[in-house]
Every structure is written in structure tokens, then in C-alpha cells.
């Protein structure tokens, strides 16, 4: 028996790694390394390595540096970080600080208008909520139909939306709900 134990201790070929052990560092360690690299300003240096640069690209979104992302957001909103209004497509300030003369009641009334969403964003929100409701067992369909009334856009967009919801309901085995949706789709067309 001692020969066998000595052979295992000496011969590395017989020693196997556990399946969960790997050569790459853990997720937390990679996060700490990425944070350190960002603080030092050496994000894509040779020391950081290719794995770090790939992670950084994934974290910031499609390899867009955070500084460019901030400027794109500023272009979208029309305001810079210091409160100066800007022309879309340029970074030149137009006027002074933007102030508001609305009272609290006016802000409540204009809450929806202050942050307008596009039709696609509204429809995407509705779709997420409807899919969540479909996946829950024992739900009543009235709430889902109320949400579906809020779908915006031309009939072609609404038709595609209903078809995707029908597919999701069929995937979740909601036959009654699929029948109701098909009836609503026929009425809409």
C-alpha cells in the first residue's frame, strides 16, 4: 500500500483536478482587478491583459468608453452635466441654466410629459409585464387585456405584438388565453 501512496504523491499524472477548479480567477477577483485597473487609468494596457479588456468592453457595453457614453447621453437629453442646454449633435452650450417655474401640483400633472418614452419603450415595458403575468399560474386574464390595450403604434405593430404574446402564451400552455387573444386579434384587424 505504501508503494501506491508514494506513487500518487510523486507522479503528477495520476493527480486529477476537481471539475469546479479552473485556471481563471474567480468572478470577484476579476471584478476587483477591473476596478483597480479603472482607478489607475490603465484599462487596456499590456499589464491588464486581454481578459481584462474583454471584460471591460462587456461591462461598458459594446466597447464604448464611459466618457463617450456620457457624451452620447448628454446629446440625447440636450443638457450637459453643468445644466447648460445644448444643441443636438453639438457640444456647444446654447443658453444659461435651465430653471423651472412650476409648482408641485404642476409637476404632478406633468409627470408623464416630463419623461416622454418612445412607443417602442412603452411596448417593451408592456410586453415584459404581460409575459410575467402569463408565466404566473392561476392569473386572471382581465389584467393582461387591460395592459394590452396600452400597446401603441399602427395596426401592423399591434398585430406583431399580439402574435408574439400568442406565441408566449402557447409556449406556457395557456390554451384558453390563446383563444381569447386570437379573437381579439381578429377584432383588431
Curated annotation (Swiss-Prot):
Compartments reported by the entry: Nucleus
Keywords: Nucleus
InterPro entries membership: INT_SG_DDX_CT_C, Integrator_subunit6
Disulfide cysteine pairs (residue numbers): none
Short name of any one Pfam family annotated for the protein: INT_SG_DDX_CT_C
Nucleus recorded as keyword: yes
Cellular component, GO annotation: nucleus
Keyword flag Nucleus: yes
Any one GO MF annotation of this record: identical protein binding
Domain of life: Eukaryota
PANTHER family named in the record: DEAD/H BOX POLYPEPTIDE 26/DICE1-RELATED (PTHR12957), INTEGRATOR COMPLEX SUBUNIT 6 (PTHR12957:SF2)
Family: Belongs to the CT45 family.
Protein name per Swiss-Prot or TrEMBL: Cancer/testis antigen family 45 member A10
Organism listed in the record: Homo sapiens (Human)
Lineage, uppermost ranks: Eukaryota, Metazoa, Chordata, Craniata, Vertebrata
Chain's gene name: CT45A10
Amino acid at each position: 500500500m505504501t508503494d501506491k501512496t508514494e506513487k500518487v504523491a510523486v507522479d503528477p499524472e495520476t493527480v486529477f483536478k476537481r471539475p469546479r477548479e479552473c485556471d481563471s480567477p474567480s468572478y470577484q477577483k476579476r471584478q476587483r482587478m477591473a476596478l483597480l485597473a479603472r482607478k489607475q487609468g490603465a484599462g487596456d494596457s499590456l499589464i491588464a491583459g486581454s481578459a481584462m479588456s474583454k471584460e471591460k468592453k462587456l461591462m461598458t457595453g459594446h466597447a464604448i468608453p464611459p466618457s463617450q457614453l456620457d457624451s452620447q447621453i448628454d446629446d440625447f437629453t440636450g443638457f450637459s452635466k453643468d445644466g447648460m442646454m445644448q444643441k443636438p449633435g453639438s457640444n456647444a452650450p446654447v443658453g444659461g441654466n435651465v430653471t423651472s417655474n412650476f409648482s408641485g401640483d404642476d409637476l404632478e400633472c406633468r409627470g408623464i410629459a416630463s419623461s416622454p418614452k418612445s412607443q417602442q419603450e412603452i411596448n417593451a415595458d408592456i410586453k415584459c409585464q404581460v409575459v410575467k403575468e402569463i408565466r404566473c399560474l392561476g392569473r386572471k386574464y382581465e389584467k393582461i387585456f387591460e395592459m394590452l390595450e396600452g400597446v401603441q403604434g399602427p395596426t401592423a405593430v399591434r398585430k406583431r405584438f399580439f402574435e408574439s404574446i400568442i406565441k408566449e402564451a402557447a409556449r406556457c400552455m395557456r390554451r384558453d388565453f390563446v383563444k381569447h387573444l386570437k379573437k381579439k386579434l381578429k377584432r383588431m384587424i
